Amino acid sequence: MRYNTTTLSLVIAAAFVAGVVASPIAQHALADAHAESAPLAPAMIDLMAMKHADLPTTGNREMNAKGLVVTDNATIGIQSGNVAKHNHPKTDEIQYILEGSGAMWLGGERKDFKPGTLIVIPKGTAHGGTIVTSGPVKAIAIKIPPQGPTDTVFMN
C-alpha cells in the first residue's frame, strides 16, 4: 500500500510542476492567438460630439447606432433613440447613459435613468420601451458576446 501512496504522491507532484511550467507558455500562446483574431488599434473617439443625426440608421426607425469596437468576445457601440421592449437571449448588454433622461423597462419594472447611469442587462432580461423626459437619449452599449442578427426578441 505504501508503494501506491508514494507513486501517487510523485505523480501529483510531477503534474503540479508540469502545470507550473506549462501555464506561462499556454497563456502566452493563447494571448497571441486571440490578438491575431481580433486586433485593436489605438483610438480616441469623441462620443459627446456624435449627435443622433450623425449615427447610421438601423432597422428601427427610432434608433440610430454605430459600432465603435468589435472583437470576437464583445462589441462597443453608441446608440441614440428608442427601441420597443425586447430581450437578447444570447447576449449580455451594458449601457452607460451619456445624454438624456427618462424611464425604461428593465426586467419587469420601469426604472429612471439620467446621464451617468450604468445599466446592466443580463441576457434574457426585458428592456427598452423608453419614455424620454429629456433627450435625445445617447448611450454607450457593450454587448457580450457580440449580438447576432437574430438575437433580438420583441415583447408586448
Predicted feature locations:
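A short, N-terminal "cap"/entry segment at the start of jelly-roll beta-barrel domains
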Residues: 3-7, 19, 23-78, 84-85, ...
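Hydrophobic membrane-insertion alpha-helices, especially the h-region
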Residues: 11-19
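Ligand-binding loop in jelly-roll beta-barrel domains
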Residues: 123-150
